[in-house]
């Protein structure tokens, strides 16, 4: 990790995407599954490592995160709007059996592997 200097407004905007949105996503995925799967044992028995790693942030302190969400709500709401737009776009492609478009999107998005790999490589230096 590298120290990045920026003004507080820029900080709050960027952090709403790379930190706060991750927590919202994790909490809401956990909520969605808990509401659907009334039998908690089913969640435990059926969930794989992907689900566990995706909801890891939902195990964070609600007392800490609720105020953070509200304190940065203007930026977080914008981030959520962008995220929901992307979810709706994917939903539409799934509904319309648009496999080619889904594959193109997923391949483009998959470059996050390289981006995060750079983070790991920079930490090793």
What are these regions (language model features)?
Residues 24-27, 60, 93, 115:
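Amphipathic alpha-helical interaction surfaces
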């Amino acid at each position: 990790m590298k120290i990045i200097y920026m003004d507080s407004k820029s900080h709050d905007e960027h952090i709403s995407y790379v930190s706060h949105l991750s927590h919202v996503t994790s909490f809401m995925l956990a909520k969605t599954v808990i509401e659907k799967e009334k039998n908690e044992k089913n969640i435990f028995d059926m969930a794989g490592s992907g689900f566990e790693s995706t909801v890891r942030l939902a195990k964070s302190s609600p007392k800490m995160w609720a105020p953070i969400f509200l304190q940065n709500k203007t930026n977080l709401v914008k981030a959520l709007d962008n995220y929901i737009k992307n979810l709706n776009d994917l939903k539409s492609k799934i509904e319309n059996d648009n496999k080619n478009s889904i594959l193109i999107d997923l391949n483009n998005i998959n470059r996050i592997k390289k981006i995060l790999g750079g983070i790991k490589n920079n930490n090793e230096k």
